[in-house]
Amino acid sequence: MSKPNNSTAPLPFPILIGDIGGTNARFSILTDAYAEPKQFPNVRTADFATIDEAIQQGVLDKTAVQPRSAILAVAGPINDDEIPLTNCDWVVRPKTMIEGLGMEDVLVVNDFEAQALAIAALSDENRERIGDATRDMIASRVVLGPGTGLGVGGLVHAQHSWIPVPGEGGHVDLGPRSKRDYDIFPHIETIEGRVSAEQILCGRGLVNLYHAICVVDGIEPTMKDPADITSHALAGSDKAAVETVSLFATYLGRVAGDLAMVFMARGGVYLSGGISQKIIPALKKPEFRIAFEDKAPHTALLRTIPTYVVTHPLAALAGLSSYARMPANFGVSTEGRRWRR
């Protein structure tokens, strides 16, 4: 019978690598520590009743390689051996997976732990620098990603090891500072009476901010889709959309600067996800870095910390693969998150 196991021993190859999102699940198989991962087509979560069916039909039925173990990144709390996902109906059941899919070992980690693992050694071709700070230090880092929500993960460098730190940093407070902020914030939709960063810095938050700007300016909002708002903003074809994305970049800079100080992220702050990639032109305007650096009495420190947008199309899978190849380089906690036959 499979059971929880806190072993830090390497996962046995071949290893199934999975990044499970709300809409899509991405999989690859790593046959050994020196091989390139074998990628599989994205799986739409809505097309399968369970993750086990998705793995069987989307991966195992398409290859002769039988994984002995799996490492999965999921959006959701990992508290026991039934792990409900935040943004889709799947439930990850490692014991069932071991019995039904013929595996020996399953490790489940937080989705932004995987993103944090990825930024340990991201090449220049997989990141876009924002601002003038260029110092590339082997030092602690932080990644934040506006998407369905606002994910945050730290990557602490200590004793020659990279230690990913998951958390709920997307729910820190975000408050007004400028006169325009004080006009807009009363119209931001709150959660239980407060404005957290995630109420603005995600897809639905972008719409929330746009609607608040429209209310303040006395105009009728015409857009309900974040993609429409960003497209009109980048094209300069809608005044409210332009201001929405400009303020989004400002607020993202404020939160990113706060997190840089929390983690003393001299190794850099990384922005991940589709929204960050799409609004790179807006992030390269002065507002993001001005807000990022405006942290008196530590402005001089923030000016030295580089900021990047992650452009790797499969960053989470790359991070998990790095860990699977060389687990000794990372301080990944397995307590309560690893099951073995």
UniProtKB/Swiss-Prot annotation:
Its EC number is 2.7.1.2. The keyword Transferase applies. GO terms for molecular function: ATP binding; D-glucose binding; glucokinase activity. Its main location: cytoplasm. The keyword Membrane does not apply. Coiled coil: none annotated. It is an enzyme of class 2 (transferase). GO terms for cellular component: cytosol. It holds the Pfam family Glucokinase. It comes from the Bacteria. ATP binds at residues 18-23. It catalyses: D-glucose + ATP = D-glucose 6-phosphate + ADP + H(+). Keywords: ATP-binding, Cytoplasm, Glycolysis, Kinase, Nucleotide-binding, Transferase. It is found in: Cytoplasm. GO terms for biological process: glycolytic process. Belongs to the bacterial glucokinase family. HAMAP family: Glucokinase. This is Glucokinase. The gene is glk.
